[in-house]
Amino acid sequence: MTFEAKGLTKNFADKQVLQGISLQTQGGKALGLLGRNGAGKTTTIRIIMGVFPADSGEILIDGQPIRRERINFGYLPEERGLYPKKIISEQLLYLAELRGSSKKAALSAMDHWLQRLEMGAYKNKKLDTLSKGNQQKIQLVATLISNPDFVILDEPFSGLDPVNAMLLKDVVHELIDDGKIV
């Protein structure tokens, strides 16, 4: 799979946030967006995900206009997206099933990612009982549980200590080795 964004622009009211942004990558590769706070990184991600449209430009998958309903995205948002008072395993299974996974596949993927991220002991806990770093790891499990082809990570190292930052780097390398777009 190849991904290309060409000439993306976005304005909010009279403020231009993006001007002519172009990106290109393919499966088995990582693409990073670096920039200052407010530079438009998250806006670019949200346009790619279809949260809102670009004012101009195009997004292509394998040379064709993107059809988001055919792309299995995994998205780790900058802000937390899970319910703090709910049991972790229940949330993860629910999210996987929303994305079309069978219960059996969802259970298998959940157990795999919880173990891989050293979080298996926490699956029956509520999210708000975990540290910020462990909450981030659970959010990553939610991102990966449906085996996405295209993984978008917004501020993925937020709240992670050096050991868990290395663990995340290892997981990203595994995703790349599996042919994912990261």
Predicted segments, located by residue:
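The feature captures the beta-strand-to-loop junction immediately N-terminal to the Walker
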Residues: 34-36
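Conserved ABC transporter NBD signature motif
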Residues: 57-71
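Conserved ABC ATPase signature
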Residues: 126-130
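Helix-to-loop junction immediately C-terminal to a conserved catalytic motif
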Residues: 49
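Catalytic Walker B motif of ABC-type/P-loop ATPase nucleotide-binding domains
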Residues: 151-155
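Conserved ABC ATPase "signature" region
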Residues: 93, 97, 105-122
